[in-house]
A protein has these predicted regions:
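Extended hydrophobic packing segments that form well-structured cores
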Residues: 383-430
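Metal-dependent enolase-superfamily TIM-barrel catalytic cores that perform enediolate-based chemistry
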Residues: 141-268
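Conserved, mostly hydrophobic/aromatic
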Residues: 7, 45, 120, 133, ...
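Glycine-rich phosphate/pyrophosphate-binding beta-alpha loops
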Residues: 23, 47, 51-56, 117, ...
Length: 430
């Protein structure tokens, strides 16, 4: 193998992948969601893979960064951030509101840049690992565990998209406690998951409380989480915490904003987790000093990559704050990257989130598998995954044929297919 680490080519391929009608507080997932697949090719002929959000605002940043990467070594990981700082972000693309593309806190220009940098960093690490014959986790200091545990990600959902749009799947409707328990039983049976997270903020709190209680009865002692994406007021959050405190592992983002979370944390008897009020390093001081969160759900996509995820974990360890991982709709490249970095974090004490079982399509030659709710950490060079070029081309063709409706995530617009009068709800909803 030619060991020349110089970047000779960068390929950016946006794709549209099928997505089920999963409900959240802002609406429902569209029939397809956009992802960006990054291929970095070295002068030595080695290709590294990365993946991130595929909405237009990310593609606009990825293109100039890709051009500037040519001629640099894949080992220059620090240079990625210097390069990103030179890329201008269209102010019209930055909204001072919660980012609907995964409900991951307020959107900022830096977060947009980091969400693109992360894909390039993962691709560089994948290529570097292949050249050196080392798995990505070894480039990060080596694994401290042989497998990474994930949690079943439960959603209220419809049986199909309005009008039968999209590719469809074989999952049933789940809009009540019985439906959620049935969904959880299938996740446990098919993948061996031993902990369960319910995406809330969809129905009135009492209905979601009933669903969590039904899960506790069906799976005695299993770790349970409830995430309403900041849809509740402080009083409602406190009431839910009081009613479910004995069965919840943690309550995730019950209310919006660090001050509200701090209020709930002071009075509730249940730990609070977040992927909304701590999403950048500058947000840490207020959240940690006020005791607003007890667990940070990291996400290498918008934190800026795998090395920054490890930096975040170290800060959390310093302050005695727990750490786990958030998930958005993603494919196997992202899951492989998540698994490698999670394997290197000593203080990872909670099962990570993953949408992956909901995605029936992928760009890999072989899907990653869950056994007993865990993904084995690959010791193969790089990420240990292989790109299926034909499948990538087919999903890219779908993106090309789309009229633009699906290229940017908009859960409220998708909900209007079922409810024409729907608008993004103001928070708190309850």
């Amino acid at each position: 193998m030619n060991a020349d680490l110089t970047i000779a080519e960068v390929r950016l391929t946006p794709v549209l992948v099928s997505d089920p009608p999963l409900l959240n507080t802002q609406g429902v997932h569209q029939p397809y969601t956009a992802r960006l697949i990054v291929e970095i090719v070295t002068a030595g002929g080695v290709t590294g893979l990365g993946e991130t959000y595929g909405d237009g605002k990310y593609l606009e940043l990825a293109a100039p960064m890709a051009s500037a990467l040519r001629g640099r070594p894949v080992s220059d990981l620090n240079g990625l951030f210097t390069l990103a700082d030179t890329v201008q972000v269209d102010s019209a693309r930055v909204e001072d509101s919660v980012d609907v593309g995964g409900l991951r806190g307020v959107q900022t220009a830096d977060k947009l840049r980091l969400s693109v940098v992360s894909a390039f960093e993962v691709a560089c690490l994948d290529a570097l690992g292949k050249v050196q014959g080392l798995p990505v986790h070894a480039l990060l200091g080596h694994k401290v565990r042989d497998r990474v545990e994930y949690s079943a990600y439960l959603f209220y959902r419809w049986a199909e998209h309005p009008g039968g749009a999209g590719e469809g799947d074989d999952w049933d409707e789940a809009t009540d406690p019985a439906g959620i328990v049935a969904q959880a039983r299938r996740f446990a049976g098919d993948y061996g998951f031993r902990s369960f997270k319910l995406k809330g903020g969809v129905y009135e709190p009492d209905r979601e409380i009933a669903a969590v209680r039904a899960l506790a009865e069906a799976f005695p002692g299993a770790p349970l989480r409830l995430d309403p994406n900041g849809a509740w007021s402080v009083p409602t959050s406190l009431r839910v915490a009081e009613e479910l405190g004995e069965v919840l592992e943690y309550l995730e983002d019950p209310t919006s904003g660090t001050p509200g979370m701090a209020h709930v944390a002071r009075e509730a008897g249940v730990p609070l987790a977040t992927n909304m009020c701590v999403t950048t390093f500058p947000e840490i001081p207020e959240a940690f000093t006020t005791g607003a969160v007890q667990i940070v759900l990291s996400d290498h996509h918008y934190w800026g990559g795998l090395r920054r995820t490890r930096e975040l974990a170290a800060v959390c360890r310093t302050f005695g704050v727990g750490v786990s991982m958030h998930s958005n709709t993603h494919l196997g490249i992202s899951l492989a990257a998540m698994t490698h970095v999670a394997a290197t974090v000593p203080n990872l004490e909670h099962a990570c989130d993953s949408h992956y079982p909901w995605q029936g399509e992928d760009v890999l030659t072989r899907r990653l598998a869950f056994h007993e709710g865990c993904v084995e950490v690959s010791d193969a060079p790089g990420l240990g995954v292989e790109l299926d070029s034909e499948r990538l081309a087919a999903l890219h063709e779908r993106w090309l044929e789309d009229d633009g409706t699906m290229r940017d995530r908009d859960d409220a617009a998708a909900m209007r297919k079922a409810d024409p009068g729907w608008t993004t709800p103001a928070v708190p909803r309850w």
